Amino acid sequence: MRGKKKKVIFIYEGVKAEEKLLSNLAEVFFSSMADVSILNCPAEGNIYMLWNRLKKDDFETNVVDVLKEMSMVAKERLKGERASDFSEIYLFFDYDGHNDNIPKEYLGKDILGEMLGTFNNETELGKLYISYPMVESIKEIDVLTRDYKKLYLSLDEISNYKHSFFSRTDFNKYEHIDEEHWLAACDASRKRASLLVQYNSVCTYDYFIHNLNQEELYIYQKNNYICNGNLLCILNSVPLFLLEYFQEDFWNIVTAK
């Protein structure tokens, strides 16, 4: 008798870019896995909106149940599902320096740092991955060089960032990204993460797991770019999820070229 499938939920901001990219990721890497079932659900709001809903209930309400209240699309997809049905919860959101959806009493506080500390375990409240400045940053990656085309951008440029990709990129159509492109994205993002924390030696998998987690990356973003130049180091964290999820064997495949 076959074992029960492990249910995994991907939660993300919108139904456009994020949905297409993560649906492709699920198809490329998880569709052939008999023991894992992926459910994609948009929050139809940014990470601060989600955090605000959870904060009101002192984080006693599961993020899956809050999602049903926030998004009609998610509510429909989660029909008949309970929060306890999901073994793992992953959240993929954009960096949003404006904090437009934070109550006044929390303005000026490091809310994103608090959220990364709260959402740091996929088997509990969920594990949060932040892309800087947004998921569209994957279009910065050049497959041939396996690197990002730009290092940073000004915080003032974030609002127009997604409209800056007029020319064709290697990741122009999310639904057509193949495994080789994803491997290149993983290589580019692990190199960029290492650069962000100013690590000059060869980045091993052990170093990556223990030193390039989402909380550490944000601390370096905040200290070296955001608060020291009004900048963001461009980094897409979706490929970092793949490196963490599929562990060292996958890391070796990515870094073999």
PLM region spans:
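A charged nuclease-like catalytic/ligand-binding cleft shared by nucleic-acid processing domains
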Residues: 44
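Short acidic, Gly/Ser-rich segments with clustered Asp/Glu that frequently serve as metal-coordination loops
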Residues: 14-19
